Amino acid sequence: MGVGCSVTITMNVVTSYTIGIIGGGQLARMMHQAAIGLGVRTRLLASDPDESAAQVMSDVVVGSHLDHDAVMNFAAGCDVVTFDHEHVPTVLVEEMEQAGYAVRPGSAAMVHAQDKVVMREFMAREGFPNPAWKVCDTPDDLVSFGNGHGWPAIAKTSRGGYDGKGVFKIDGPDGVGEPFDAAGGLADGKQPIRILAEEFVDFRRELSAVVVRSPSGQGAAYPVTETIQRHGVCAETISPAPDLSSDRQVELQTMALDIAGRLDVVGVLAVELMEREDGSVVVNELATRPHNTAHWTIDGTETSQFENHMRAVLNLPLGSPALTAPVVVMANVLGGSEEDLTGALQHCFARDPELRVELYGKSVRPGRKVGHVTCLGNDIEITRRRAHHAAAYLMGEHDA
């Protein structure tokens, strides 16, 4: 155990290491699936024994990612620790490192996904594309920002938000109190919650540049993906992003790899982008873990983001991110009226034998990510229709 963790091979047999995953969601579940093929043991810290990953893993510790003793005791039983989410307090990640545990990604990288203000400061300092932004200490500061940059303005809590939570579109001075009220509800006394104001970017679409980086500095870049959001949640991805030239693909991939290198990221880094009408982009958010916008890589590339994340964590050479089809479309299954997901598969598979489905073992409730479907093809619109039908049917829309 320790910071030098890497897989060794003796007489053609991989010496098995234990990767600890903090967080029991579907990302951990799919990391575990990737680790099986590598002959690597996984250990899970989950808040509930019925969480998605806990259902399929044998070595499960039930405990909170906010509990100091639970996290430190868990790390002691692992060769290297990685994450299903960014919600472990930064101070706890730092303490694991100080105790000599191998943590990948490390706290210095991960904080840029945990704290939006820290991320914006880094982007500005390093010259990456930011929207206009300002840290607001008071509602009056937010009024001043909106008056200066125009309404509507976007206000975000610096920590605690995901899938559109913690993000507020403020139409005018009368609405500036809401984000400050939300920040008060998120405060835990351990980490400051600040309000970040950003200009409202009138973007034409959202893109995602997902890369992987190993401790030795090797990088791999997946094709840039167009993402379609509904109610702040990713509903669909199209890969590679349509109407994006090869040169522009390379530029955005290179930028994402550059960010990963400067932050010393180990594992997956997702760079969420907003593309304006003129083709320019600004960085929206970062994620230092496998990402929903790259679930399509399980079936649509030679090496999935999950396997490459596991490889990076173990300092193994990274696998090829090359496409396995000209067009790959993923559609999320967002909980609807269909409770018998297994029964619905009979229709979906009979209709489309090439359909790929991942269900996460989660109970169904409106808007909740309970799975995704992936379709590979040659024509964008035909492939999208296939994915839309399957996802809609699994959500209970049987007339789709």
Describe the residue ranges of each PLM region.
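Active-site nucleotide/adenylate-binding loops and adjacent lid/helix of ATP-dependent enzymes
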Residues: 112-208, 212-259
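ATP-binding N-terminal substructure of ATP-dependent carboxylate-amine bond-forming enzymes
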Residues: 4-121, 140
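Short beta-strand micro-motifs enriched in acidic
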Residues: 212-214, 274-276, 360
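A short linear hydrophobic-aromatic micro-motif
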Residues: 132, 152-154, 193-198, 269-270, ...
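Protein kinase-like catalytic core scaffold
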Residues: 220-223, 269, 281-285
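Peripheral (often C-terminal) accessory segments that flank ATP-dependent C-N-forming ligase machineries
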Residues: 5-7, 11, 311-400
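Active-site "cap" helix and flanking loop/linker of ATP-utilizing ligase/carboxylase catalytic domains
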Residues: 250-271, 277, 287-336
